[in-house]
Amino acid sequence: PPALALGIEPFRNHLLDRKPVNRNASIITKSMIFTIIGNAFYITLILMLQSSINILNVAEAKGETVMFGIFAFSALFNAFNCREFNFDSIIPNLTKNKLALQIIGITAVAQIFFTQVFRDFFNAVPLSVMEWIKIIALSFTVIIVDEVVKFVFRLFKKENKNDENMPKVEA
């Protein structure tokens, strides 16, 4: 459901400032590939850390349910990262698509509800409120890490533009 809501993102005025794209160009840019691989790597990393060293410090019997929760919430929070192209921050437009926020919120509540209520069907165990908070907090770091990476890339891009404007020194 979050993917469908992303399809109705409001128009971004800054998109008009970009250079036209060749009609034969790939729909997936290098920055998108980098972001997809980077976020997949980070989600895999936190899942591996939870699996190997139990970073959330939960009972072993709850391990699989916690892993499922981390995966589901990481994917859900990663939907926010997909709202902007290239290395643009999601923060300025975070609350502009109310429908997307509602759908993501409903999906988050449904994730917890179905895991708790239909645990036998999902082969899960009930989790405490504190365990859900830990899962959500860890999963939310997908947004934080993505924003930090985008910020660093914007800084380097800005520095490179400044370097291009500097006069060349011949040796």
Model-derived regions, located:
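C-terminal transmembrane helices and immediately adjacent loops/tails
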Residues: 1-171
